[in-house]
């Protein structure tokens, strides 16, 4: 991902304020609600029967936190996203058979959740920088797909 120095600073400054537990669960939960076909990858998560069930599901929250912790690793390695996400790309491709388009969907949902949480602080410039980052992460996660 090519970010200017200003964009990198904006991304890392805002990320320092993110509550990974809260935002991760909310982003993954919203993905599962808005794009219900993504639920098929989470059969073992129990009750995903309604928006309330999904948003309150402890397994969704825990996995959302895990996802955002990985995203944090990516933010520390913006110049080597493919290397950073190589193992996760392989896992999601070869073992889990996740449609790589879902990575883009989750990235866009994450941007919406960040905008909701940070309001005016999530300026158009910050949003543009985050859009670049989530696109880069989605691309890196899709790298092992044929």
Swiss-Prot record:
Red blood cells. PROSITE patterns: GLOBIN. One of its GO terms (molecular function) is peroxidase activity. The modification Phosphoserine is found at residue 44. PANTHER family: HEMOGLOBIN FAMILY MEMBER, HEMOGLOBIN SUBUNIT BETA. Belongs to the globin family. This is Hemoglobin subunit beta. It comes from Phoca vitulina.
């Amino acid at each position: 991902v090519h970010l200017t120095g200003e964009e990198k600073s904006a991304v890392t400054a805002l990320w320092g304020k993110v509550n990974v537990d809260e935002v991760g669960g909310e982003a993954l939960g919203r993905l599962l609600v808005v794009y219900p076909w993504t639920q098929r990858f989470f059969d073992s998560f129990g009750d995903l029967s309604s928006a309330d069930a999904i948003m309150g599901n402890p397994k969704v929250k825990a996995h959302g936190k895990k996802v955002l912790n990985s995203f944090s690793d990516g933010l520390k390695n913006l110049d080597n996203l493919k290397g950073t996400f190589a193992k996760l790309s392989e896992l999601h491709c070869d073992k889990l058979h996740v449609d790589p388009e879902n990575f883009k969907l989750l990235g866009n949902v994450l941007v919406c959740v960040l905008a909701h949480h940070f309001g005016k602080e999530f300026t158009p410039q910050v949003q543009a920088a985050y859009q670049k980052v989530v696109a880069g992460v989605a691309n890196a996660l899709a790298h092992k797909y044929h």
